[in-house]
Amino acid sequence: MKAETTTGVEELLNELVGRAAGEVGLILFSLGIEGEFTDDQLSLELGIEINEIRKALFALYEIGLADYVRRRDDETGWMEYYWRINYDKALDVLKRELEKTAKKLREKIEAETSTIYYICPNMCVKVSYNDAMELNFTCPRCGAMLDYLDCSKAIEKIEEEVRRIEEILESLDKNSG
């Protein structure tokens, strides 16, 4: 799967993995490991603390890019985790995360367009019109008069981001279908 992806998709996947699992997660994902492995093996081979490896693997698991099975070690009796990176699910995970982001952005647009906001000129607070009325249009922290906040530019930027995500999703659907 890794060889077939475009540079843009790889960049998006790397951004997603980095955000979810940090630098160690990005290292693990970029290794292209086939088959099962243990966190102990990776820790020894990569020289990275086992707790960092585990943290990254569980973060990858949380977003669906890794799976594990637990097996008892016959010699020690301890439970061991055998991990697998789900490269074959990467595009689906990326699509799902992009769709979640677009949904959150649409909700933000809805909130910004359905509410009138006022802001302190000293950037202490941002409050709704109703809250501003209760405060007599005075900042509760510094006492400055609250100013009307024009959210139109912010809304435009959010809408632009939603369009960009929708274009990416459309492109992913065309390339994977």
Curated annotation (Swiss-Prot):
Domain of life: Archaea
Pfam families (alphabetical): TFIIE_alpha (PF02002), Zn_Ribbon_TF (PF08271)
PROSITE patterns named in the record: HTH_TFE_IIE
This protein's UniProt keywords: DNA-binding, Transcription, Transcription regulation
Keyword Transcription: yes
This protein's record includes keyword Ribonucleoprotein: no
GO biological process: regulation of DNA-templated transcription; transcription initiation at RNA polymerase II promoter
Molecular functions (GO terms): DNA binding
Position of the signal peptide: none
SMART domains: TFIIE
InterPro entries linked to this entry: TF_E_archaea, TFE, TFIIE/TFIIEa_HTH, TFIIE_asu, TFIIEa/SarR/Rpc3_HTH_dom, WH-like_DNA-bd_sf, WH_DNA-bd_sf, Znf_TFIIB
Residue ranges occupied by any HTH TFE/IIEalpha-type domain in the UniProt entry: 9-91
HAMAP family in the record: TFE_arch (MF_01909)
Function per UniProt: Transcription factor that plays a role in the activation of archaeal genes transcribed by RNA polymerase. Facilitates transcription initiation by enhancing TATA-box recognition by TATA-box-binding protein (Tbp), and transcription factor B (Tfb) and RNA polymerase recruitment. Not absolutely required for transcription in vitro, but particularly important in cases where Tbp or Tfb function is not optimal. It dynamically alters the nucleic acid-binding properties of RNA polymerases by stabilizing the initiation complex and destabilizing elongation complexes.
PANTHER family linked to this entry: GENERAL TRANSCRIPTION FACTOR IIE SUBUNIT 1, TRANSCRIPTION INITIATION FACTOR IIE, ALPHA SUBUNIT
Subunit-structure text: Monomer. Interaction with RNA polymerase subunits RpoF and RpoE is necessary for Tfe stimulatory transcription activity. Able to interact with Tbp and RNA polymerase in the absence of DNA promoter. Interacts both with the preinitiation and elongation complexes.
Homology family: Belongs to the TFE family.
Entry text on domains: The winged helix domain is involved in binding to DNA in the preinitiation complex.
Name of protein: Transcription factor E
The species this protein was found in: Archaeoglobus fulgidus (strain ATCC 49558 / DSM 4304 / JCM 9628 / NBRC 100126 / VC-16)
